[in-house]
Swiss-Prot record:
This is UPF0145 protein SPO2021. It comes from Ruegeria pomeroyi (strain ATCC 700808 / DSM 15171 / DSS-3). Belongs to the UPF0145 family. Gene3D superfamilies: Hypothetical protein apc22750. Chain B. Pfam families: YbjQ_1.
Length: 104
């Protein structure tokens, strides 16, 4: 499965558009990790706890996106957009959307 942010795939022709597909993931952050992440942010370091959560959420959203594209009979998703949003006090939502297509 080819997943790309570009509107097409160089050297390949889109032969069918199957529709818009979306994958979403909402992850809760652990309170203890939040405290340590805040301390890390204050001293100017990177927060490994948040980075790990963000990576997990992104991978889950993209995996769902691919699964929905496969269910439509697509072999690629073009024009993929990733959006990140904090929900409530400690929830992270990642959504991935794009167009499921068939490439030759």
């Amino acid at each position: 499965m080819i997943v790309t942010t570009t509107p097409n795939v160089e050297g390949r022709r889109i032969t069918a558009y199957k529709g818009i597909v979306v994958g979403e993931a909402i992850m809760g952050a652990n309170v203890v990790r939040d405290v340590f992440a805040s301390i890390t942010d204050i001293v100017g370091g990177r927060s490994g706890a948040y980075e790990s959560k963000l990576q997990d959420a992104r991978e889950t959203a993209l995996s769902e996106l691919e699964g929905r594209a496969v269910a439509l009979g697509a072999n690629a998703v073009v024009g993929v957009d990733l959006d990140y949003e904090v929900v409530g006090q400690s929830m992270l939502m990642v959504s991935a959307s794009g167009t499921a297509v068939v490439l030759d």
